[in-house]
Design a protein with these regions (language model features):
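Conserved, structured core segments of small domains
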Residues: 1-106
Length: 106
């Protein structure tokens, strides 16, 4: 399994000035389906940690998948995928880093 740090930010302006409009209801329904999708991935062990930022409109999580193809499928099936800016960073381990440093030491 490979772990990736994923940071996602919505790339849309939300018309939330009037929360009782049908447009706001559609946006909230879309966001709810995205959070439900993330919760389902967490229950399956694909998301192993993370959650929404409390100070900005974004989420951060650690995705644990066996292949890059599965990661792509997860992103593609995300309800907010067309409106999401995503940063993905592969994660190593501290043990691997220490081993690499030992090999570099004289």
């Amino acid at each position: 399994m490979s772990k990736f740090l994923v940071i996602e930010k919505p790339e849309m302006n939300l018309p939330m000035s009037s929360p009782n409009t049908s447009e706001a209801a559609r946006v909230m329904k879309l966001f709810k389906s995205e959070i439900e999708y993330k919760a389902k991935l967490q229950k399956k062990g694909k998301i192993v940690g993370g959650g929404p930022f409390l100070d900005v409109s974004a989420v951060c999580y650690i995705l644990d998948v066996p292949t890059v193809e599965e990661m792509g499928e997860i992103f593609f099936n995300s309800p907010l995928n067309p409106w999401t800016h995503r940063e993905v960073h592969p994660l190593g381990t501290f043990a691997d880093t220490l081993e690499g440093l030992k090999e570099m030491a004289p």
